[in-house]
């Protein structure tokens, strides 16, 4: 299983960053490996989404259940679990924690592919791809959050 975690202080309000990550349909506009994104069903706290990922000549589609939570102390959470596709297991969590200078962003992801070959291929790019994803979200925040 591959794992990654990232923590950073960003100069934006938690709700603004939460809204950015919750806007799954916009991912193809700024995530380098996301070729398509579609919402299958949604309500205020849960989305079933379909993403098409292209990386190093491979294209894979998967569905996820994405759930948001706002805690009593103002922490915004987005939890994602893959429900179909090439993952034996995928879980990620975004936490947006109020901070004196904006938001403490915490991101966690761990996953395992169903194919050993895919697992090895993705594994060799996993850290780089995840870091690029975080940077893409940060760049998007600079562009769209006022």
UniProtKB/Swiss-Prot annotation:
This is Ribosome association toxin RatA. GO terms for molecular function: ubiquinone binding. It comes from the Bacteria. Toxic component of a type II toxin-antitoxin (TA) system. Binds to 50S ribosomal subunits, preventing them from associating with 30S subunits to form 70S ribosomes. Its antitoxin is unknown. Disulfide bonds: none annotated. It comes from Rickettsia prowazekii (strain Madrid E). GO terms for biological process: cellular respiration. The keyword Cytoplasm does not apply. Keywords: Toxin-antitoxin system. The gene is ratA. Belongs to the ribosome association toxin RatA family. PANTHER family: COENZYME Q-BINDING PROTEIN COQ10, MITOCHONDRIAL, SPERM PROTEIN HOMOLOG. InterPro entries: COQ10-like (IPR044996), COQ10_START (IPR005031), START-like_dom_sf (IPR023393). It holds the Pfam family Polyketide_cyc.
